[in-house]
Amino acid sequence: MASNVFDHPLQELEGEDNGVKSEKASLLETSGSVDTTPEDSGHRSSDGHRGLDHCETAPVGLYGDMLINDSEIQYSRSLTEKGSPAIHNLKLDRLSEQEKQKLIVELVRIQNDGTVEVIDNGTPVSELWEFEPTKGQSTITYEKSLTESFRSIPRLKIAILVVGTRGDVQPFLAMAKRLQEFGHRVRLATHANFRSFVRAAGVEFYPLGGDPRELAAYMARNKGLIPSGPSEISKQRKQLKAIIESLLPACIEPDLETATSFRAQAIIANPPAYGHVHVAEALGVPIHIFFTMPWTPTNEFPHPLARVPQSAAYWLSYIVVDLMVWWSIRTYINDFRKRKLNLAPIAYFSTYHGSISHLPTGYMWSPHVVPKPSDWGPLVDVVGYCFLNLGSKYQPREEFLHWIERGSPPVYIGFGSMPLDDPKQTMDIILETLKDTEQRGIVDRGWGGLGNLATEVPENVFLVEDCPHDWLFPQCSAVVHHGGAGTTATGLKAGCPTTIVPFFGDQFFWGDRIYEKGLGPAPIPIAQLSVENLSSSIRFMLQPEVKSQVMELAKVLENEDGVAAAVDAFHRHLPPELPLPESSSEKKDEDDRPDLLQWFFIQIGKKCCLPCGGV
């Protein structure tokens, strides 16, 4: 899900009516802070770098403290790793906050679809674009293959914080299941709507604030980064507060069903879980970002929420979006830091600034679809698609199976969690297109309400709901969908030529990638969907050469294991100072030892608290 749920900073700098200004000026009401003090410690760290001095881990025994029997984990170097470039500091860092705002106002134009256009001309861009090399390396570089080294990793309590739709949650659920196989205790914290989905997979669940349906509807109404009016500002404030306020409890509160105590020793999060890095700072634990869309600056393609006139400004587009997001959330984040975490407020270009560029980051797409950019260093991994195998347990209705077998492979058409302004009109376009192209079609109702027909469903159409894509797509000749990262990945793995009908955010990015690689036609924005262009797209996808191109990629994807690579990246980026369990000095003999009551502390210190941010 694209990160666009908050008010736009430029609206503070340009003309606004008094109602909007008043709404933006209001602060979150004060509420009681969550107690982050460990049970056996009544004080907080005086170290300004962290809000707490330690966190407690799960009990471990003398012989049960390692993840695998031989006490070793073998690591393999990422196939996409290309070494570490030297650090570069922007000369922008020397400017005041007011000067930065002025530059951004001159650089940015807001588009009707809510995205930002970066104007690459004049002195402002030159100032932002100028680099100043610094001495040293950005991170530890791996001179030898990681397969030559071994590490013993203690079992950890891991909190995974995910904000978004089901498509955003699904790859993290796959990762959570794999982490559990290593002996970790994993809690997946996401919206209450997905409680049964997560628990059915055998993973501990904790609810985060925010309603994914409302978030999706907000983004569909407002497209990119800009709320359309005062009422939208109020709605997204409410969502933002609910999300941020729930992050700390998700990392320290007992399980709501079993009352089993929990305190995160490591955090995995996606960028829209705003506040993640501040919770990690307060708890003194490492954090690893994973996401399904690009969020790390690169010269090879622009930020999915930005438009730029030429490649010279690609890198700059990430800085612009980053700044705008930070200016939108800074009041809430600093209130959260002071009121809940007992941390000092921060400015954007402080040690804990507003980006994820200095955090270990894993991107959940195949390097064969979007290779790792050459300017992303060893902190960043492109791990591959993280599939959750749902199709193996799916039992379709007999009626559905008979319909599939009666004719040629159908075309799938569905828009997942995306809301539709006029479901009937969209359905009319779909039906007329299938008639025009003489194709059978499977229409997924989704959250948009497709398929509510006044008449009988035509024989060439079958309506489905909650059908696993990894079972459904292999039955299809081609797929038409909104372009969510997970849906796109599943279609490609099934060997289906793809037409993307983007609504907002990274969906346009994936539509462009599909078209560039010859895996489908040019994307059709939902507002431009018509019988003519949808019919043309279906005919394009049914060409043998397009099918052949997609099948070639599908064979490659079949041999990838993005979940394993993601878990490997998480383990590899854990702090080297991570202490291992030690025997209790108070034990008198083997028989007198307390049952699994050896505790160890994770203290990552300054070396592990990498510069991090507010997104």
Swiss-Prot record:
Keyword Thylakoid assigned: no
Comp. bias regions, Basic and acidic residues: 40-54
One GO MF term attached to the UniProt entry: sterol 3-beta-glucosyltransferase activity
EC number(s) stated in the UniProt entry for this protein: 2.4.1.173
Enzyme class: transferase
Region called Disordered, residue ranges: 1-54
Keywords recorded for this protein, A-Z: Glycosyltransferase, Lipid biosynthesis, Lipid metabolism, Steroid biosynthesis, Steroid metabolism, Sterol biosynthesis, Sterol metabolism, Transferase
Any one GO CC term of the record: plant-type vacuole
Task of the protein: Involved in the biosynthesis of sterol glucosides. Catalyzes the synthesis of steryl glycosides (SGs) and acyl steryl glycosides (ASGs) which are the most abundant sterol derivatives in higher plants. Can act on several sterols like sitosterol, campesterol and stigmasterol. Is required for embryonic development, seed suberin accumulation, cutin formation and flavanoid accumulation in the seed coat. Both UGT80A2 and UGT80B1 are required for the normal production of SGs and ASGs in seeds.
Listed name of the protein: Sterol 3-beta-glucosyltransferase UGT80B1
